[in-house]
């Protein structure tokens, strides 16, 4: 297999026919070499299928979180039935942001599913790559700022996850 071109060659031996077997001429076996291009996109298709499954799982988790938080409320009597405390997600701005952010993430995931299916069907589609190249070459400042914002967002998410784990450990010890 030629590693530079990505093609493999296979030899096809063609035996002599019955009409030439009985002749006393020299026997020649013809060998034809055909270039066989391997079917590409195998690993890309696998990655695309894994991407699609992860998107569906993330969509299910985001929708479950949004629905659970959005429908959570409780009324607690305090001393008597006349004085009551009511807790709802919209009492705290953090929980409201949580519901809105998960709703937006769910919408994004729903809208991105057709593109994920397209990468499964056609793993060699170059439109997305070309669009990224166009944005990177034309909007250099924009791409750098977006990259920085995404990295900062991931750092914030990791810190928040760490804070949740730390809070869980602190609550467990009490």
Swiss-Prot record:
Q: Give TM segment ranges.
A: 47-67, 97-117, 120-139, 151-171
Record keyword Lyase present: no
The organism's place on the tree of life at top rank? Eukaryota
Annotated region Disordered: the residues are 1-25
Disulfide topology: none
> Which residue ranges does the entry give as Extracellular-facing topology?
68-96, 140-150
Name listed for the protein in its UniProt record: CASP-like protein 1
């Amino acid at each position: 297999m030629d590693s530079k071109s990505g093609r493999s060659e296979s030899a096809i031996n063609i035996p002599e026919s019955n009409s030439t077997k009985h002749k006393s001429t020299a026997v020649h076996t013809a060998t034809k070499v055909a270039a066989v291009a391997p079917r590409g996109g195998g690993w890309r298709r696998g990655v695309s299928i894994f991407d699609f499954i992860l998107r569906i799982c993330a969509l299910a988790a985001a929708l479950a979180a949004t629905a659970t938080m959005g429908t959570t409320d409780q009324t607690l009597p305090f001393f008597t039935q006349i004085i009551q405390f009511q807790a709802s997600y919209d009492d705290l701005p953090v929980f409201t942001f949580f519901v809105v952010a998960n709703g937006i993430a769910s919408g994004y995931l729903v809208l991105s599913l057709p593109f994920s299916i397209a990468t499964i069907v056609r793993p060699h589609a170059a439109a997305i790559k070309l669009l990224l190249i166009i944005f990177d070459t034309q909007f250099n400042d924009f791409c750098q700022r977006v990259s920085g914002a995404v990295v900062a967002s991931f750092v914030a998410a990791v810190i928040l996850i760490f804070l949740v784990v730390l809070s869980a450990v602190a609550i467990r010890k009490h």
